[in-house]
């Protein structure tokens, strides 16, 4: 009689977490695992190889080689071989060049990685990409956000299911073989991008507005707001089933399956903020406050997501009501309505107007400067914004327009 080893609590918890995050029936669609060869992604791979076939789905993998290590190509090939042992198909290796991106080392690698993910989604028509972020990663993300001082949005961390990477949207410019990022929240591709993606696993919010993909040339520079009616209902999904699973548990999963994982040297490089938080800050917090700090930070992220999503929903509804498109390059917002609006909603409306009509993500400083335009006695009458956008007070309205649409 064949003896099967009894699964460990870590394996059981991870299987349950992935089952609860994915749809009950994948209808034979492909789900890709983002593989790096580290313990978290290998744990996600073995769990997905058990879970996804039971949900009537197919499992593949995408390995992104950043080329930052001398032996990175060999490691990518070893990861591919390991994925083949667990019957993943297809297995794609994407080689990227973060050095082409004009950002910091961490941001450059992330931008290049997600650009490769988008290419892979387009190439394979996959339903989703599974990212192996853990509860520890979530806690570190919340602390990083607090360091940046980005308000409640810094507390919400990463979502279990998202339709783009958090905080950024990515454009892969194949013509010049470079990658650029436009910072935005909850962005989507516009209707001119007809990639045949399946519907997401959770109902869409019909009141939420989405924004054009950066590569969309048909609306470049225009004040065009995109809503659900303009968006193809099929697009790629990013899923993080392990946000309640600790890094210790993913190590136990690899141990159970006899997997040797790769330790990225960059995960020990204290030049990076996340590494300093992981190795210097979190241990101090755990020792001085208690071992439950990372769980508290993760729980805070969940609660903050609920609050910020509701405030964003109210802000979107108000923007729907008050924004008027004056031309292809200009919109206006009524000052009286904004003056009567509570400050948290008012600031969100201002940010959303810039984001949704002009794909510009405003800093706190720029948002406050636009808010000052509401004061008739203030000396400020216009504000220069990124990407040649200007906000200007004219009569009872605030106009936002591009350089082409200057009043």
Curated annotation (Swiss-Prot):
The keyword DNA-binding does not apply. InterPro entries: Rossmann-like_a/b/a_fold, TilS/TtcA_N, tRNA_Ile_lys_synt, tRNA_Ile_lys_synt_N. SUPFAM superfamilies: Adenine nucleotide alpha hydrolases-like, MesJ substrate recognition domain-like. It comes from the Bacteria. GO terms for molecular function: ATP binding; tRNA(Ile)-lysidine synthase activity. Its EC number is 6.3.4.19. ATP binds at residues 36-41. It is found in: Cytoplasm. GO terms for biological process: tRNA modification. Coiled coil: none annotated. GO terms for cellular component: cytoplasm. It catalyses: cytidine(34) in tRNA(Ile2) + L-lysine + ATP = lysidine(34) in tRNA(Ile2) + AMP + diphosphate + H(+). Its main location: cytoplasm. Keywords: ATP-binding, Cytoplasm, Ligase, Nucleotide-binding, tRNA processing. The N-terminal region contains the highly conserved SGGXDS motif, predicted to be a P-loop motif involved in ATP binding. Belongs to the tRNA(Ile)-lysidine synthase family. NCBIfam families: lysidine_TilS_N. HAMAP family: tRNA_Ile_lys_synt (MF_01161). Ligates lysine onto the cytidine present at position 34 of the AUA codon-specific tRNA(Ile) that contains the anticodon CAU, in an ATP-dependent manner. Cytidine is converted to lysidine, thus changing the amino acid specificity of the tRNA from methionine to isoleucine. This is tRNA(Ile)-lysidine synthase. It comes from Tropheryma whipplei (strain TW08/27) (Whipple's bacillus).
